[in-house]
Swiss-Prot record:
Name used for this protein in its record: Uncharacterized protein B0563.8
Species of provenance: Caenorhabditis elegans
Amino acid sequence: MSKDCKMVSELCEKVSKIMTVVKELRAEHRREFVQKPEEIEMDVFWRQTFVRFTEPAEKWSNIRHRPAPATTPIDIVYPLREQDW
């Protein structure tokens, strides 16, 4: 192997060693300085139920989904381009 090839291979080895050391230091730093999540007090607002099955069946048996009215189609205006050739 020529002198240049040896030098390049040595440089590659050194760079790879440096990269592994940097990765290890970053991982160690992350492990040491882990931020704890903040504790937030949250209020839960429960949604009122729409149907209560404890009530008589006559109250909730008539509830049906009404289909939404169909909308009119939208006219899409496409720009007209003239040919230049």
